Amino acid sequence: MNISAEYWLHHAVFYAMLFLIHYFCGLLVIHRNLKVNYTRKINHFAFFFLPTLLSMVIDYPYSAATFFIDLVCAIIFLTFFIAPVRNRVRVLSVMFCSFDRPEDRPLTLTWLYTQFIASYLVLIPLLAYFESHALLPVIMIIIIANGVGDGLAEPVGIRFGKRKYTTYALFTQEKYVRSYAGSACVFITTFIAILAFHSYFSPIQFIAAVLTVPVLITLAEAFSPHTWDSPLIYAVGGALLIGILHFL
């Protein structure tokens, strides 16, 4: 397994920046009383889009091996925040405050661990399929739907979401709240993403994608367990795109 030096440099810079962002967001929560719901989404955007931005400067060859190492790195990153570690390292404790929503306790890390693993398990076959059919850029539709749409859903819902609905969560009987305004962010973002990648569809495929993908991804986000949006968005959106591109 030959991993390029550019890959390691890219990820060293990425995780250094990610640690800094988490730390400063944690300080904002502790000293400025900024809502964790907002800082958590700042972290979310950083995790999704910093790698892409860094790749413009530090590019590396993609492979199944690098994708697997990405998953390992994400799990190691989360492991820094388990209680025995963060309680002994003040910096990590501050960073943990940037994504530890009070309503998620004591399952904050459990949900993040399981969501990361489930998301990667869904993405691996999707990446393999789209790459084998020379359609790899199409997967960006569901990544944008999750990264931008779901990323905006919570802060928009908190600020503007007067009409809300409840959803369940794994490993608990508690109910959690989502907003129609937040779900609208997922719908609009997915619609725009399809428009941006329209060149990969035939006219009939494009019409089918526009009419079905935003609706079903929005429903996937709405009915997914609390904090478990990503794997459901990827699974539903990916399966639907494969169906459209393969059968139409």
Label every PLM stretch briefly:
Residues 1-9, 24-67, 79-192, 197, ...:
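Interhelical loop and helix-boundary elements at the membrane-water interface
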Residues 202, 206-207:
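Short alpha-helical packing/oligomerization segments
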